[in-house]
A protein has these predicted regions:
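Left-handed beta-helix
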Residues: 1-6, 204, 212-433
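Short aromatic/hydrophobic "clamp" motif used to bind/position activated sugar donors
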Residues: 120
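Active-site acidic Asp-centered loop
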Residues: 123-125
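Active-site-proximal specificity loops/subdomain of glycosyltransferases
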Residues: 81-105
């Protein structure tokens, strides 16, 4: 698959619903899972799928993402014509930014023209999932398709957030609704087939449908191709994606390794475009048997190496023991006589004595050429149901996520957690409380 497919990763989104996390960075650059950025999942899928011609199209507040790509993803040998290249917005068609997903491709059409690839794989850089794009390419070729759209089954109650596909018995798309109020279900079920924003195009057909006014794949290009009778198909991610992984089992008293052909995270996909979705997907990772496995051997998720010392837990008095339960603790973290439960601590976080953190995501500190900035949680702090961005400093005795009125009075973003009486609190980057 290496050279017959060109990957174009759309990574310029503003991520307005993720504010304030995206006030200083684009959505694909938001830290996730302790040591990762959101875009690392899409790029890892590309590498694991054998793709070696990859463009990353950036636009909105791209400095953080650009730095991450240079530091962590500039490893393919260009002398062998392999690359992951960042392409900033060029304004090729006038003095304007991208007007939509398809317009981003149109403004970079020269890159596609210069490529020998006959298929173009268009990806979003802001979803959390594992996917073998080779299986989708094989499906596309087997159907002699002009376009294949990867789709996932979602409850009908949630389908209005997505583009919804209607397909025939051969998975050919016969109808498309972009974020409909009354989504059409899969016949006989209470589920809908939702577009994942992942497309395989035949290059020639893609060029035919990128004319003026064709700015967005969901709103313009896909409906136009379906209406024109083009061969447009849906790849059912829920049933057809396959990620193999090793697992250890006991057999006759001996621990042995075997390959599971379709691991459980083959069906995992999350759009983390809202704060509550980001928080929930983050906490998926801390389960004993997580929905998506960051520790797999056969489908690794790569990240940017960071030069922090190992994590450290100190103090052992009965009421002052440094401990983390059902949590992810990154390098450079010091838990100094504090208790952490069901949380993620990013690199460079220091939690001082007698503090308690639960159901929270702390992105940690930040390394620069000049200094190391840490996130510091003072003594006796209580943090529940929170997202705390980088380089935050909390004074001793600070409570977050306990009193909604108090959180709002301090100017923090507060949103309800669906199905509960609790609330999620977001502390922006660099804040001191």
């Amino acid at each position: 698959m290496s050279f017959d497919v060109l990957a174009m990763v759309l990574a310029g989104g503003m991520g307005e619903r993720l504010m304030p996390l995206t006030s200083v960075r684009s959505k694909p650059a938001v830290p996730f899972g302790g040591s990762y950025r959101i875009i690392d999942f899409t790029l890892s899928n590309c590498i694991n799928s054998g793709l070696r011609h990859i463009y990353v199209l950036t636009q909105y507040k791209s400095h953080s993402l650009s730095r991450h790509l240079r530091a962590g993803w500039d490893f393919l040998p260009k002398r062998l014509d392999q690359f992951i290249d960042e392409i900033p917005a060029q304004m090729q068609l006038g003095d304007r930014w991208y007007k939509g997903t398809a317009d981003a491709i149109r403004q970079n059409w020269t890159l596609i023209e210069q490529s020998p690839a006959r298929r173009v794989l268009i990806l979003s850089g802001d979803h959390i999932y594992k996917m073998d794009y080779r299986r989708m390419r094989s499906f596309h070729d087997g159907k002699d398709a002009a376009l294949t759209v990867s789709a996932i089954r979602v409850p009908r109650s949630e389908a209005s957030q997505f583009g919804v596909l209607q397909v025939d018995e051969d998975n050919r798309i016969i109808g498309f609704q972009e974020k409909p109020e009354d989504p059409a279900p899969i016949p006989g079920t209470d589920e809908c087939l939702a577009s994942m924003g992942i497309y395989v195009f035949n290059r020639e057909k893609l060029g035919q449908y990128l004319g003026d006014g064709m700015d967005d794949f969901g709103r313009n290009v896909i409906p136009a191709m379906v209406s024109a009778g083009e061969r447009v198909f849906a790849f059912d991610f829920t049933t057809q994606n396959q990620i193999s992984e090793n697992e250890w089992i006991q057999r006759d008293g001996v621990r042995i390794k075997r390959v599971v052909e379709r691991a459980t995270d083959s069906t995992y996909w999350r759009d983390v475009g809202t704060l509550d979705a980001y928080w929930a997907a983050s906490l998926d990772l801390v389960a004993a048997a997580p929905s998506i496995n960051l520790y797999g051997e056969l489908w690794p998720i790569y990240n940017c190496p960071q030069h922090f010392p190992p994590a450290k837990f100190v103090h052992e008095e009965a009421n002052r023991t440094g401990v983390a339960i059902n949590s992810i603790v990154s390098d450079g973290v010091i838990i100094s006589g504090a208790k952490i439960r069901r949380s993620i601590l990013g690199p460079g976080t220091h939690v001082h004595s007698y503090s308690y953190i639960e159901n929270s995501v702390l992105m940690g500190g930040e390394q620069s050429e000049e200094m190391l900035l840490e996130t510091s949680i003072g003594r006796g702090c209580l943090i529940r149901n929170a997202i705390i961005d980088r380089n935050v400093r909390l004074s001793p005795g600070t409570y977050i996520g306990v009193d909604r009125g108090n959180d709002e009075a301090r100017g923090l973003k507060v949103i309800p957690i669906q199905g509960t009486n609790e609330h999620l609190v977001v502390v922006p980057k660099g804040m001191e409380l």
